[in-house]
Amino acid sequence: MFTMKKSLLLLFFLGTISLSLCEEERSADEDDGEKGVKRGIFSLIKTAAKFVGKNLLKQAGKAGVEHLACKANNQC
C-alpha cells in the first residue's frame, strides 16, 4: 500500500510539472500571436493611410492645376 501511494504521488508530481510547462508554452504562444495581430493591424492601417494620402494628393494636384490654368487664362 505504501509503495502504491509513493508511485501515485510521483505520477501526480510529474503530471503537475508537465502541466505547468504546457501552460507556460501556451502563454508564450499567445503573446506571439498578439504581436502578429498588432503588426497586421498596423500594416493595414498604414496601407490604408498611404492609399488615402495618394488619392488626396492627386485630387489636390488636379484642383491646383485647374486653378492655375484658370488664373493663366483669366477666366476665374
From Swiss-Prot:
Entry keywords, A to Z: Amphibian defense peptide, Antibiotic, Antimicrobial, Cleavage on pair of basic residues, Disulfide bond, Fungicide, Immunity, Innate immunity, Secreted, Signal
UniProt GO cellular component terms: extracellular region
Principal place of residence: secreted
Residues spanning the signal sequence: 1-22
Annotated compartments: Secreted
Propeptide: 23-39
Family annotation (Pfam families): Antimicrobial_2, FSAP_sig_propep
UniProt-listed GO biological process terms: defense response to bacterium; defense response to fungus; innate immune response; killing of cells of another organism
Tissue spec. comment: Expressed by the skin glands.
Superkingdom assignment: Eukaryota
Disulfide bonds: 70-76
Function: Antimicrobial peptide with activity against Gram-positive and Gram-negative bacteria and against fungi. Has been tested against S.aureus (MIC=1.25 ug/mL), B.pumilus (MIC=2.5 ug/mL), B.cereus (MIC=7.5 ug/mL), E.coli (MIC=12.5 ug/mL), B.dysenteriae (MIC=7.5 ug/mL), A.cacoaceticus (MIC=12.5 ug/mL), P.aeruginosa (MIC=50.0 ug/mL) and C.albicans (MIC=2.5 ug/mL). Also shows a weak hemolytic activity.
Family classification: Belongs to the frog skin active peptide (FSAP) family. Esculentin subfamily.
Protein name: Esculentin-2-ALb
Lineage: Eukaryota, Metazoa, Chordata, Craniata, Vertebrata
